[in-house]
Amino acid sequence: MSSATAAATATIAAAAAKLAATPAPAPSRRRLTLRGNPTARRCVAAMAVSTPRSAAAAAFLERRESERALHFVKYQGLGNDFIMVDNRDSAVPKVTPEEAAKLCDRNFGVGADGVIFVMPGVNGADYTMRIFNSDGSEPEMCGNGVRCFARFIAELENLQGTHSFKIHTGAGLIIPEIQNDGKVKVDMGQPILSGPDIPTKLPSTKNEAVVQADLAVDGSTWQVTCVSMGNPHCVTFGTKELKVLHVDDLKLSDIGPKFEHHEMFPARTNTEFVEVLSRSHLKMRVWERGAGATLACGTGACAVVVAAVLEGRAERKCVVDLPGGPLEIEWREDDNHIYMTGPAEAVFYGSAVH
């Protein structure tokens, strides 16, 4: 062996010894938390994923996540489901209407009827509530959404027991109260009955209100009563030919859009189809403006009771059955306010790339 070869061999041996003496980096262990599924929690808890990464790669991934990941809580109120976003640090929504529509897609996104943002309060309100529908449009208010909003606030603020909040919405000030049984009672304010303020082009039939007006849709003459709960509603109990509806027989995907986009409703409309079970018990299905057929609509249930009272079909305090479950609605004479009581609950927690 030449002296040069011997020197090279010695250098390689020394480098190998130094490498062997260097402790191996501990594998990173990433924990994924899943709530609501005990089996999944056990499986995930048993996993330890080794992901040796360079410092540069780790920094890139963390930066990317902080810029693109939207953290949310999925809530539902009688099956009307929403992606709830903590937006208290800004008056600008964290996602655009177009991004919200993608998030709401039930095949390519998270899946929801809308995205709701908890934002800083204005004009003396504790919080501001904004909503993007599943089509990206922005409604003034959502009754089921405001119940979810109240429960989400309680979770964010770690509040226990009964609490009420003043919430600024596109429909004005709304005051929900979390009750001891976990349900949320909401002062929905006063109904708007003047046609131009709803808005509708239908002529008034009772004082300034549009009550049992004729509306031609799909070859039939429907009798409708129009109400705004800060957002427009068209309520019908049947046609001139068919006085009593059996709402389960309706194909909403056919008839709903024809009401929503009818020329008599310049801002489009939500439509409620109602079956009277008794003077204190109503059953409805709804086609929501910007969301289509949904399992529940809180403002719609309020509008239904108002319409039923105006048409002499029901009392001021009713249980309203929706596909997702019942709501308790009361239209009080003393203050002309409508009160809605119903459930809202968290479904799961997650993050989505947007």
Curated annotation (Swiss-Prot):
One of its GO terms (molecular function) is diaminopimelate epimerase activity. The keyword S-adenosyl-L-methionine does not apply. SUPFAM superfamilies: Diaminopimelate epimerase-like. It is an enzyme of class 5 (isomerase). It is found in: Plastid, Chloroplast. GO terms for cellular component: chloroplast; cytosol. Its main location: plastid. Residues 1-44 form a transit peptide. The active site is at C142, C297. Pathway: Amino-acid biosynthesis; L-lysine biosynthesis via DAP pathway; DL-2,6-diaminopimelate from LL-2,6-diaminopimelate: step 1/1. It catalyses: (2S,6S)-2,6-diaminopimelate = meso-2,6-diaminopimelate. Its EC number is 5.1.1.7. It comes from the Eukaryota. One of its GO terms (biological process) is lysine biosynthetic process via diaminopimelate. Keywords: Amino-acid biosynthesis, Chloroplast, Isomerase, Lysine biosynthesis, Plastid, Transit peptide. Pfam families: DAP_epimerase (PF01678). Belongs to the diaminopimelate epimerase family. This is Diaminopimelate epimerase, chloroplastic. The gene is DAPF.
